Amino acid sequence: IVTRADYSYRYRYFIGGSFRQDRSSRFSPEHRTGNFWSVSAAYRITNENWAWLDPVKRIFNNIKFKASYGYNGNLPSKYYNWRTLYNGSGRYDSGHALSQTFRATYDLSWEKNNVFNVGVDLGMFRDRIRISAEYYSRKSTDLLQEVPVSQVSGYSTMLMNTSAGIRNRGFELDLDAHILNKLFKWDLKLNMATLSAKYFGLEQDIIGSNAQIMRNGQSVGAWYLNKFAGIDSNTGQVLYYGVDEYGNDIISNSDNPSFRRIVGKGVPTVSGGFNTLFSYRGWDLSALFTYAWGHDVYDSRAAGRT
């Protein structure tokens, strides 16, 4: 079920709202329904007939302030998490046998996202240059995660809704320019986004199999590794930074798991792209660039070499 309503007054004031009800068979019948909604508002100041705006409107044909708030949900990636699954191809004592391959999580429900955006849209020189700047904040709760369980159950992990959450914050900037005359046309597009994504609400640290850790207050994708301290010139052994039983910093040739620490993050702080198209007398020249920085790349193969 999807409904949406929008209202505009004199092309200056805008309000909108939407409601959506989704149902998914990836959840048990009691938890299939998700009710999601959003509201938005905008104000185009350049449609006001104020004298002091006249010099501004010679450059900016459009200045629109906007804001929105909404609530939505995420599905698990697998289809049958709420059902216990069996494999009938096994054999036991020369006979056929059933083995349990997946244990049901009947209470599984939607991940929840609360999203807030506020920004401004600018149009310059009859929209030949358009700029959109926006701040966003997204709070995700009831995260669907593989949680370690007692191996007496026959499994090492189970998919569950946890108390953990992720708070994403950042800015987004888009620039779109069209420069043309009788002989040539130049289209330019530039976008940039910043991201801060941190965990909260975790009951304990969760160390993944991919050298990353989930810890309250730390970035999503934080690398949790032994920190390299160089090579011992006498023995050729790899050295690591660590801490002794008294809490003193040491350098050791042991890769003791207790020496592991957060040494970086895999999620870029800034990312974006640049796209340009230049046309002249039937000839086209285009280019596309993407970039990201503020993150660390872990090369597992290189990490095992000395």
Model-derived features: where do they sit?
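Conserved small-residue
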Residues: A164, L180-G266, V297, R301-T306
